Amino acid sequence: MLFRSKDAPALQAWYKRHLGIDVQAWGGAAFEWSDAEGKPIAGTTAWLINPAESKQFDPSKASFMVNYRVEDLHALVKALKEEGCDVLDKIDESEYGKFGWVIDPEGNKVELWQPPAGQ
């Protein structure tokens, strides 16, 4: 989950103080997954607060962006395009995985993330 904030450092501090979220220098936190018994399993949920002027949310004007973990980004992007969805042409690939984006019918930018193998 990604948020856009008018005062990112202050909002990050609020979440850290009141909800105990361990906000890192990059502006967010990563929550490791576990099963119902508390045993670690592969996966993380990213949580991030960005400054209001961040271009990461463009072309959406929303103050948030949801990130969905996907199994095969290239196949999903292809299917979404075939279904007539507004898919951004850019796909980013890095050590953090593959990232793509689609705009939902209300204009919200949705991030699609395929993690690296083994995560």
Where do the PLM segments sit?
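Vicinal oxygen chelate
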Residues: 1-6, 22-26, 34, 52-119, ...
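Generic structural signal for residues positioned in beta-strands
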Residues: 30, 46-48, 65, 111
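Short amphipathic beta-strand starts and helix->beta connectors
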Residues: 47-52, 85
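Short, solvent-exposed coil/turn segments
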Residues: 26, 42, 59-63, 95
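Short secondary-structure boundary/capping segments
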Residues: 37-40, 55-58, 91
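Core segments of cupin and vicinal oxygen chelate
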Residues: 2-46, 82
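Active-site donor-binding loop signature of nucleotide-sugar glycosyltransferases
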Residues: 33-35, 51, 93, 114-115
